Each structure stands twice: as C-alpha cells, then as structure tokens.
Amino acid sequence: MSTVVTIPRSVSWKGDAIAVLNQTKLPHSTEYKTLTTIEEVWKSIVMLEVRGAPAIGIVAAFGLALASKKYTTLHIEEFQKKFNRDCNYLGTSRPTAVNLFWAIDRMRESIQEITTIKEAQKILEEEALRIQQEDEAVCRSIGEHALTCFKDGDNILTICNAGSIATARYGTALAPFYIGKEKGVRLHAYACETRPVLQGGRLTTWELKQAGIDVTLITDNTAAHAIQTKEINAIIVGADRIVANGDTANKIGTMNLAILAKYFDIPFYVAAPLSTFDITKQTGAEIVIEERDETEVTKIFGKQVAPVGTTVYNPAFDVTPNKLITGIITEKGIICGDYKREIVSLFEKTS
C-alpha cells in the first residue's frame, strides 16, 4: 500500500522573484526568503541559505532568469554582455558545486540563437523551470534505484544533507528513504551531525522528521562506534562533484565514512544525478576544494569556542577515492566496478 509522504521544497519561482527556504534558520523556524536581484541570489548561495548542489543549480538558473527581466530596454548586444557577466558572477558563489556551472551553461546555451530580449527572457524562464522539473524526476529515479540496494528494516548511515531541501524534491542520498516510506519499506537513518555547520543535525533530521521517517542523530566522531554496535547495514551519501574516474567530492567527513565502510565491510554508496559529474576532470586531484571562513569552526551559533587567533583549516569538502565506493547511484542506474569505463559509457549513451 502506498503512503502519502510530506516532502519539503526549498526553491519556488514566483515570476518576478524567487522564494528560498532559508536553511540557516532550520530547525528553529521555517522561513522563506524572497530574492529579487542577482546579488541576493549570490549572497543566498554563499551564506548557505540555499545549499545542496542541485538546489544551487536551480536557484542560479532562476537567478539568471530574474536578472534578465531588468534588461528590457537594452540593445541585444548589451543584453548578452550583461547576461554573461551575471553568469560569471554567479559562478564565483560555490566553486566546488558542479551543478552550479552545469545550470549556468544550460541557461547560457539556451539563448545562443535569440534575436530579441523578450524572446530571451521567455526562454530563460522556461529553461529554469525545466531544470527544476527535470531534477525532481531525476531525484525520484535515483531513489527508485537506490531502494533496490536496501531491504526493509535496514539501518543506513548518512552525512550532511542530500535530501529534498538540497534538490528540487526527494533528494539524492535521502531519496530512498522517501520512496521507501511511500512503498512501505522501513529504512532507519543514522545522521552524522556534520560539523562545522551541522547540516546533518539541523537539516537531515528536520526534513526526515517532517516526513515521519525514523532518524537517529549521532556526532561525527560516533560513526565508527555506531557501525560497530548499531548494526549499520550501509552508508549512502550525496556528491558535489564526481569526476571521470569516479572520485567524488562531498561534504568534509565523507571520506572518513568511506574508510570506515571498507574496514567494517559494509557498502558505501554515492547518490547523484548525471549533472553532478564533471568528466572534463580525470581524477579527484583536479577538483578545487572550497575553504570557508574560520569562524565556522571557532564559533558555534555565534559563541566563541576556541581561543581568539587560533589557526583554522576549514575545507568544505573532501574527495573520496573511487576504490572506496561500492556503487554510484544515478537516475540511469547504478555504476560499479570499472568507474572510468562505466562513466564514459553512460555519457555516450545519454549524449
């Protein structure tokens, strides 16, 4: 029997504005912030009000559609110049999230043949909506494929938030929990809190509880003990960038879990859409890793917890080598084994 599941959304298009779920306010309050300029979109991405690679791509696409509406009186050449400037500007917001650049490129390519600004504005709005709609379908498909990896009653560990609020809907790593709930397959999530800004503790627990899905929160340094004592059956994570050989950039701490999975001999899955793949890069060594402000580590909710002046290293992501990954779950199926060959083959089939 199917069950209706409450699945929150993070981005909505209002025609002349974008409404984003302000994820920095969760779980204490559910606030939607209205964005009306390209600068507000950029800041919202940088400040993690909207986050998750697919959601970042979606809000960037809407941001470009929104910005185009302010250029109605320009000549077409000047419009193109300002639009390209906006594309480059948004690209500086989160350099590791490949979906951001994928969405920007799609928006840029969609108006290559336009002859009027009115035509461009219409096409850009339609393309942004299409990106959002496609992502929802893609995430559901990822969830369907991922669910085949698990059985009723499984305990599954995850990190950060690769859920509905990080995408158009359903999420990637959390998609099988939603699809499982719909189909009566009970999956229990163990969520790492995910320092330094606690996306697991604040966001994953919040959205799964909204849907009535069992979730247990653990500190990041409890992961090994939890696997050892709580009968964790598998680990599933999202991705911010996957390169041609399968090396995967995701939230800092992901590689720790992959190493633990190898040691304890449990499956380690990556769930991501094809738009998260960057096959222009051959190995993870080529991925640019964003480093964030030291205050994310030295302060917790505004309170200083380390001596002032302490040196901080705060990378937002790490890169998990392909040899630690059991399978990469995409909307087209599950890739495993020879990742380089399988990824090339997958993109040849979809091109």
From Swiss-Prot:
The keyword Membrane does not apply. Pathway: Amino-acid biosynthesis; L-methionine biosynthesis via salvage pathway; L-methionine from S-methyl-5-thio-alpha-D-ribose 1-phosphate: step 1/6. Keywords: Amino-acid biosynthesis, Isomerase, Methionine biosynthesis. It catalyses: 5-(methylsulfanyl)-alpha-D-ribose 1-phosphate = 5-(methylsulfanyl)-D-ribulose 1-phosphate. The record marks C160 as: Transition state stabilizer. Its EC number is 5.3.1.23. Disulfide bonds: none annotated. GO terms for molecular function: S-methyl-5-thioribose-1-phosphate isomerase activity. Catalyzes the interconversion of methylthioribose-1-phosphate (MTR-1-P) into methylthioribulose-1-phosphate (MTRu-1-P). This is Methylthioribose-1-phosphate isomerase. It comes from Bacillus thuringiensis subsp. konkukian (strain 97-27).
